[in-house]
């Protein structure tokens, strides 16, 4: 099993879009794929299940932290989903990080080849625990000063987690990149001196969100240009390990 956790302490950086594409890439490669949506907004769940009502239902990902049986939703694409919902805040109130190691063992025992986890930006067990469980933590960000500040906090958290999870791998993914922006290129050069950057970088493309609105990854979206399709296929294949 490979667990990929997508996280950032700043919202609105393309985290959920990446989660959906990683999961759909896994299914296309024949991997038994589970998405764990730990964000109370449940956006990944809504996109993948093609059902806005799913994010208002209890159960789902919350069952991981309890002794309740797991009941993943099987989506039309074939992936399994433990959905996010507004009641997940209660998990942070009653479960500590030490308890989350038990959750890791439970997760590792499940019959999946790939698990992709979407985390909330706020610090708590739903944010920290999945980084302890992961083989790879991916942090998407826009190359601007606000994102760099949040990245510093995220990387500090990852270094703390490495004290109990020495083999943890992390990568930073540049999203919404504008090639002609000198400021962005300077930020990226600075970042590259300190953290491992994942390539290719992602530029802003309307086709990416439009594809998910239709329930398909961008490389299967008829209105996406060839470059966008190839970039996303290469990126997701590299991150899921195949």
Residue map of PLM features:
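P-loop NTP-binding core
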Residues: 1-242
């Amino acid at each position: 099993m490979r667990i990929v956790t997508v996280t950032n302490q700043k919202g609105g950086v393309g985290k959920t879009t990446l989660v959906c594409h990683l999961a759909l890439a896994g299914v296309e490669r024949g991997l038994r794929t589970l998405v764990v949506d730990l964000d109370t907004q449940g956006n990944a769940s809504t996109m993948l299940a093609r059902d806005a009502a799913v994010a208002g239902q209890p159960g789902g990902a919350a069952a991981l932290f309890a002794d309740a049986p797991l009941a993943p939703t099987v989506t039309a694409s074939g992936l399994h989903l433990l959905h996010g919902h507004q009641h997940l805040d209660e998990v942070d109130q009653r479960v500590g990080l030490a308890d989350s190691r038990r959750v890791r063992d439970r997760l590792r025992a499940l019959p999946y080849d790939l698990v992709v986890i979407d985390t909330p930006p706020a610090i708590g067990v739903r944010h920290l625990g999945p980084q302890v469980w992961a083989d790879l933590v991916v942090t998407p960000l826009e190359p601007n000063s606000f994102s760099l500040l949040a990245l510093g906090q995220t990387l500090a958290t990852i270094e703390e987690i490495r004290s109990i999870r020495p083999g943890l791998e992390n990568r930073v993914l540049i999203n919404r990149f504008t090639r002609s922006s000198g400021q962005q290129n300077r930020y990226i050069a600075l970042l590259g001196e300190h953290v491992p950057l994942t390539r290719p970088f992602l530029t802003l493309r309307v086709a990416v969100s439009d594809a998910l609105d239709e329930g398909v990854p961008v490389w299967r979206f008829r209105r996406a240009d060839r470059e966008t399709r190839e970039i996303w296929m290469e990126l997701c294949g590299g991150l899921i390990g195949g």
